[in-house]
Each structure stands twice: as structure tokens, then as C-alpha cells.
Amino acid sequence: MPIQVLPPQLANQIAAGEVVERPASVVKELVENSLDAGATRIDIDIERGGAKLIRIRDNGSGIKKDELALALARHATSKIASLDDLEAIISLGFRGEALASISSVARLTLTSRTAEQQEAWQAYAEGRDQAVTVKPAAHPVGTTLEVLDLFYNTPARRKFMRTEKTEFGHIDEVVRRIALARFDVTINLNHNGKVIRQYRAVAQDGQRERRLGTICGAAFLEHALAIEWQHGDLTLRGWVADPLHTTPALAEIQYCYVNGRMMRDRLINHAIRQACEDKLGADQQPAFVLYLEIDPHQVDVNVHPAKHEVRFHQSRLVHDFIYQGVLSVLQQQLDAPLAEKDDPPTPRQMPENRIAAGGNQFARPSEAREAATRFSITSSREPAASGGSSGGASWPHAQPGYQKQQGALYRQLLDTPAAPRPAQPSAAPAELAGHSQSFGRVLTIVGGDCALLEREGSLALLSLTVAERWLRQAQLTPGTEAVCAQPLLIPLRLKVTEGEKRALAAAQSALTQLGIELHTDALHVTVRAVPLPLRQQNLQILIPELIGYLAQQNAFDVGNIAQWMARNLTSEQASWNMAQAIALLADVERLCPQLVKTPPGGLLQPVDLHSAMNALKDE
């Protein structure tokens, strides 16, 4: 067969194979054209699931008579004119393929009128060469597109269409997604002459939540957490469902938009899933409605034929931006952790440590907590304190319950009265003084946060939480050289007062030694780097608390700041297992060998089994 140019109808039908998958694809393309035309009202009429009729009527700007024939031609569009336009697309459509493709597999009629014209005109294409006929018609300002008998001339495609109910369900889903993208547009959906959906235009935030509840359901609206997150040209807004109340029905609500364009992007979904993975069960999925705004030059939408996917020029930056935004609003929903039972490693008590241990409802909020509140992102509920070493324990799916049940049995067996706390942290029981190389062998985990150790024939309980705090303090305390600073992919910018600016300037040298790089300007401070132990923390809360702590100090000692940070970091473990405990003790023995020889108060407690054994003998 010789090489030849394909007839226009055949070429359009080939293109339609990518653009027109089913009736819902037609609705999507035509409604997006209406939105690009500035429509504020769109009426959608469907018959027999879209197989018989799809009619889209809008009150947009309309199409001039001289451009009607071009509108049905391939690669004819008013939305881009140069390569520069293609590299910064702000419209929903831009290829100029939709109308030509649809008209090649259905009987399409285009009727339109502009505000400058006194009459409307109607265009339709027919025949092998897709010749366009234009004739006068009656129509208000705007455009109406009628698509009759979809796939009438491609029987093979028509056989793949599902039932009327299924096809209309896909159309309904497309309209739902569009209604969530454009709150300012009224959208009416009719099927077989019956009104199915009416989404009235809204503007205010409260009314937006009303439409959100109408589309996503009252259950999602009740547990939705609002997100308002921004960095440079990146903005993330929307709602994510509280993982504590996520159900299989809610997990079906996963709507994401990039510059107003509905997307199913794997990078975005992965970032959201990663932010929620510690709060959801293995078989659960997050529920969200999120809007990402980004510089059009930084995203390529000319990737997927149906424009369902995009490619970000800085994909890692976008991924981490979304991850941090979702993670921050979820962490603010954690209940305030209980106060730690152990005293700090040093007898000195500082008021800011009360913050990390958990909010005290009977005390006034400290300046550090007030500072954190100023910097917290918007949430639909009152945020709870997320500091402290047990911040992750509130999530029910963090660890299975076996460890807690096992710990309860051991507590009953080893119910030994606690020995009086020594006056000095350096003082330790005499029977522990001989151990200089290792804490001993880990036998099991008790209560989720203590390890039962065997130490030369005797037993002892070690607080893993306290051991982790000592390890962090050792990691944060600089030696002969400053702690290595880890640059943040997205620098954190916070507003500060004049007093806080002066405190940061005075503490600049100490913070640099600790691996914290700051830059201050007139009203803000920008955190550019932090030490490794702080990388996985919620810096939106921790840094304001640190600034509040520094503002209360008269002198800035590196050791005291490192100690404060160690006590205020959120524990990475909600409930410990054997492998984690063994790894932690190995690190403590390597970095803090003095703790093995002279355990401080609150770290290690000998267990006396004699009373339990005597009780058994008495029986």
C-alpha cells in the first residue's frame, strides 16, 4: 500500500480514539470549553447515558460567525498562538482537537452568538471531507453544542459502551469534579428530562463548604481538615479527611486539581499517601480535595492526550511541598500528649518544658505556645499540641496491640515499689555501678516504651523514651566541630516580633554550632537548614517554640539549647519493638558511654523479684 494522506474524517476518528473514550469524555471536553469561554452558567442535558444526546449550553463569550467553521477544524484554537503560550498554559483546552474529533464520531451541531452580533449562527460538519455548513439560528449570547448518536459510524466503539446507568455514572462523576474545581459557576445536570444535579455558584468560604458537603457528603465535611499552605509560587489549599475517621466510603473521595485542572497524578497521590501512611491502616486510603497552584511555566500539561496527567519541572520540590503541607495539618490534630513521668536529666526546671510535655489547662499559655499558634497553618478544628515524646501514640493504627497486652502481664508480675529517686542525677544504685560496657540483653518490651533488660543475672527496666532523649541530646550537642547542617528543600519562613529578632541575633552563633541556619529580615525569619534529628519534625511548630524559648533566655548556652531541643522533639516511635530498642541502645552505648556506667535518674530502674518469689512461697 503506497503512502498517502489520510482523509480528514479518518484522521479525526483516529484522534477521537485518544480524546473521546466514552460519553463522559465528551462532556468533559465540552464543559471545559465553556469554562474557557468565561461561562458562569452551564446546563448539561443527557439522554440514554449520553449515547443518544449530549447537549451543553453556556452563557460564555460565544464564537464569531467567521470562526465557526474553524472551530470544527483540527488544530484550530483561540487559546494558544506560539511556543511561549504552550509552555505556560492557563486554559483548560489548547490542542484544538476536541470538536473535530467529536464531530467525526457523532452528529455535532454548534450554535453560538457573541454579544456584538445581532443574530446567532449554527455550524455542523458532514461528509467524508468534514465540510462545514453555517446557517443562521436563534440563540442567546453564548454557545450550545449538541452531540447526537455518539459512535454511530464506528460500531466497534459503540459495542464497548456500558449500560446507560454506568455511562451516566461516569458523566455524573466528571460533573462533580468540575463543580469542585469551579465554585463560581452554576452547573445543572439533567438526564432523560429529569434534573439530577444543581450546583449553584458560590463565592464565600462558608458557601464553598456547603457545595463541598453536597458533592462529597456530610461525613467528609464533618471530618474535613482545611489546608492553607504556601511557599513561593506554590500554594496548596483544600481539605483532607481526618485519618481517625476515614472509612472505605470516604476513601473514594480523592480529588486533586493543578491550576484548576482536574488531575490524577501519581506524584501528588504518592505525596499525600506518604503524609498519611503512619495514621492509616494498611488497607486504608486518604480522602482529600486539594488544589495546587503553581507557576504555569513550572508544569507541562501537554503530556496526556486527555490531559489527565502533568509533568512538573521540579517534581521533588512539589512532592515535598505537598507532603509537608498535608503532614502539618494532620499532626495538629493529634491529642496533646500526657506529661512525661521522668524528670529532666538535670534538676533545673524550665517553664517551656511544660509545653512539650502537654498542655496544662490550668496554667496560662506560655510565650512559646503563643508563638507557635501564630505560625500554625489554618485548620478547620482547634489544633492540639503536637510536641512531646509520645506525639504519635494517639493514632490507633501505629502499632498492633500485642505489645501493650504483653506489657500489662509483665507489669503485674514485676509490680515492685519504685525506689526513692536519688538526689543527684549522677547517683545510681550500687548494684549497677559495675556495668561499664553495655546495658545488658533486651528480653522484651514492657508497656510499649520500656525495655526489660538482663544485667549479669539481675533484671532492670530501661525507659526507651528517656534513652532516646539522651541520644538526641548527644547528636545535637556539637563536639570539636559544629553539628552538620542539613539544607531544607523548602525553607521555612516565619513572622517574628522585634524581641524575637533580637534574641535570634544574640543566639546566632549558638544556633550555627547546632546546625540551624537562619536568615532574618524586617519582619520574618527564614530557616534554611537544620540538624539531622530535626529533619523529620514538624518545623512549623518546633521552630516557633524554639524562638519563644530563646526570647525568654538571658544567655545562650549551646548545651542548654541542645537539651531543650532534645526534650521537645516528637518521638519517632509511638510504640517500640525489640529491633528498635536494640538499635537505640546500641547508639546510646556508642555516643553516651557514661550513661552505662552511671545511669541518670529516670533512665534505669532495677527490678526486685524477691518479693514476688516470696509471695509464691508463702502460698
From Swiss-Prot:
Q: Which SMART domains match?
A: DNA_mis_repair, MutL_C
Q: Does the keyword RNA-binding apply?
A: no
State the function annotated in the UniProt record: This protein is involved in the repair of mismatches in DNA. It is required for dam-dependent methyl-directed DNA mismatch repair. May act as a 'molecular matchmaker', a protein that promotes the formation of a stable complex between two or more DNA-binding proteins in an ATP-dependent manner without itself being part of a final effector complex.
Pfam hit, one: HATPase_c_3
Cysteines paired by S-S bonds? none
Identify the keywords attached in UniProt to this record, alphabetized: DNA damage, DNA repair
Q: Which organism is it from?
A: Klebsiella pneumoniae (strain 342)
According to the UniProt entry, its GO molecular function terms are: ATP binding; ATP hydrolysis activity; ATP-dependent DNA damage sensor activity; mismatched DNA binding
UniProt name for this protein? DNA mismatch repair protein MutL
